[in-house]
Curated annotation (Swiss-Prot):
Taxon lineage: Viruses, Riboviria, Orthornavirae, Negarnaviricota, Polyploviricotina
Protein family (similarity comment): Belongs to the influenza viruses PB1-F2 family.
Predominant localisation class: host cell
Superkingdom of source: Viruses
Site (Low pathogenicity): 66
Protein name: Protein PB1-F2
Compositional bias ranges of the Basic and acidic residues kind: 17-33
């Protein structure tokens, strides 16, 4: 009994999954409840941030009144350079 208490919950969950597979029962992935909540929160936060980013870019686009072809080209190039820099730093 003491040995099982020393095993981290991740290993014990993997062990349980292997046992279930070998016995032919339906496998169920066991995760730590706080980890599941954390991942749900992360996904919600990231999707909200992505939506906000899209809304901001659309507002910027709509705020341009009678844009000339040159001003649009400059604007797009600036955005592309900024995006490229972020891509390389990450």
């Amino acid at each position: 009994m003491e040995q099982e208490q020393d095993i981290p919950w991740t290993q014990s969950a993997e062990h349980t999954n292997i046992q279930k597979r070998e016995s032919g029962q339906q496998t169920q992935r066991l995760e730590h409840p706080s980890l599941t909540r954390l991942m749900d929160h992360y996904q919600r936060t990231m999707s909200q941030a992505d939506m906000h980013r899209q809304i901001v870019s659309w507002r910027q686009w709509l705020s341009l009144k009678n844009p000339t072809q040159g001003s649009l080209k400059t604007r797009v190039l600036k955005r592309w350079k900024l995006f490229s820099k972020q891509g390389w730093t990450n």
